[in-house]
Amino acid sequence: MIKQALISVSDKSGIVDFAKSLSDLGVKILSTGGTAKLLADAGLPVTEVADYTGFPEMLDGRVKTLHPKVHGGILARRDLPEHMAALEKHDIPTIDLLVVNLYPFVQTVSKEECTLEDAIENIDIGGPTMLRSAAKNHRDVTVVVDPADYATVLDEMRANGNTVGYKTNFRLATKVFAHTAQYDGAITNYLTSLTEQLQHRDRNTYPATLNMAFEKVQDLRYGENPHQSAAFYRDIAAPAGALANYRQLQGKELSYNNIADSDAAWECVKTFDAPACVIIKHANPCGVAVGANPHEAYSKAFQTDPTSAFGGIIAFNREVDETAAQAVAKQFVEVLIAPSFSEAAKQLFAAKQNVRLLEIALGEGHNAFDLKRVGGGLLVQSLDAKNVQPHELRVVTKRHPTPKEMDDLLFAWRVAKFVKSNAIVFCANGMTMGVGAGQMSRVDSARIASIKAQNAGLTLSGTAVASDAFFPFRDGLDVVVNAGATCVIQPGGSMRDDEVIAAADEHNIAMVVTGIRHFRH
């Protein structure tokens, strides 16, 4: 039964209402510093921890709750007579509810002007100590680290005579240990990233020790293949616009492959300003287009490769209206992603309950780093988020691209970044015309892209081509030009650049180089 609570929070959202409800239930409230003042100013009966322990706060607040009267009241097992006798001997009441969240360390060190001293002063000591004590003794103590749990605790107390059940206490305790582990991990990441100058602005991007925290979203039926088990986890700091923050409106449970392909589709479509549609199959774009509206964008994207689009993942960067929904509904679709769906579109897809509809906020946020597991290790790199601008391009041929060709080149280059290497992408008029992906030789990717266009009944005459890396020989260039391309965008940097550029001049096409590569493995 909860008779006494200790409340000390940095995040004060909802705390006054929560404390008032506790007081109304007859719970005595202990508190510290700013939290105590906030509660007292709200007219709530509150006892300062310093008055409770008989020992004042000291060392500029570094020592507040590190006292036997606090930790004894938290850690004592109520089922052990010797523990309870020790409390009685030293006149220590039990503390049955602990409500604590920690100094904002992560927010502090994320500021550019943060110094080591600022960071050190935001390392909480008393808070984690109390939290761990309460979580360890969760059989007897309810511990709350997240304001989202206030309502649950109050509901159980009201229903059960100020008692919170063991199942809830256990869940809250596991939440505490996850929280303190994350907190300590953030401290370790920060301290091991410091250079010899020990200033925040001189931090190494990659700390000596890397700690990451993820929370489980769901178990999955299986992994990439049916014999593999799997689960989906969300980065606790996932930005609003990330796939992990999706809201599923309808459809079957997402599979491992659905999630992986959906991420590829969403990250690609977010890069376009105009209404865009991206169709993904096996993590590769098989159709990308922009248009005046979602319907036009989808119609153009679908034309690229109708065969591969069957059972694909489709993403839009605009609301899916009824017209677009009617077009999409004619095909077999696994997942449909958009910032929103009109009511008419929702009603239309309600008749197709197997189609998974995902809404995701169209934010600019994306992962800061790209991670790849290898045997016994982890590769970490900054995200390939570079979007080349026209003024950054260098024309290396005698013929310069026309304004229309330049638009097509930039579109093709944007798509190529999301195609598995080796990547060759034909584009024209804001749509992909042929995509060659994942081949061991660039010339084979060029041939496949050409064949794909031919199979879809598309002409490549007058198209722009993007190559995610340089042409090592002229053979790949010859293939795309013979297919109909009139301009090419590529990184440059090959030992045979002169030979490739000479071939471009021989064909009288325009070629621009970006100076950056977009390998994707």
Curated annotation (Swiss-Prot):
It catalyses: (6R)-10-formyltetrahydrofolate + 5-amino-1-(5-phospho-beta-D-ribosyl)imidazole-4-carboxamide = 5-formamido-1-(5-phospho-D-ribosyl)imidazole-4-carboxamide + (6S)-5,6,7,8-tetrahydrofolate; IMP + H2O = 5-formamido-1-(5-phospho-D-ribosyl)imidazole-4-carboxamide. Residues 1-145 form the MGS-like domain. GO terms for biological process: 'de novo' IMP biosynthetic process. PROSITE patterns: MGS (PS51855). The keyword Magnesium does not apply. Pathway: Purine metabolism; IMP biosynthesis via de novo pathway; 5-formamido-1-(5-phospho-D-ribosyl)imidazole-4-carboxamide from 5-amino-1-(5-phospho-D-ribosyl)imidazole-4-carboxamide (10-formyl THF route): step 1/1; Purine metabolism; IMP biosynthesis via de novo pathway; IMP from 5-formamido-1-(5-phospho-D-ribosyl)imidazole-4-carboxamide: step 1/1. InterPro entries: AICAR_Tfase_dup_dom_sf, Cytidine_deaminase-like, MGS-like_dom, MGS-like_dom_sf, PurH-like. GO terms for molecular function: IMP cyclohydrolase activity; phosphoribosylaminoimidazolecarboxamide formyltransferase activity. GO terms for cellular component: cytosol. Its EC number is 2.1.2.3, 3.5.4.10. Pfam families: AICARFT_IMPCHas, MGS. It comes from the Bacteria. Keywords: Hydrolase, Multifunctional enzyme, Purine biosynthesis, Transferase. NCBIfam families: PRK00881.1 (NF002049), purH (TIGR00355). The IMP cyclohydrolase activity resides in the N-terminal region. Belongs to the PurH family. This is Bifunctional purine biosynthesis protein PurH.
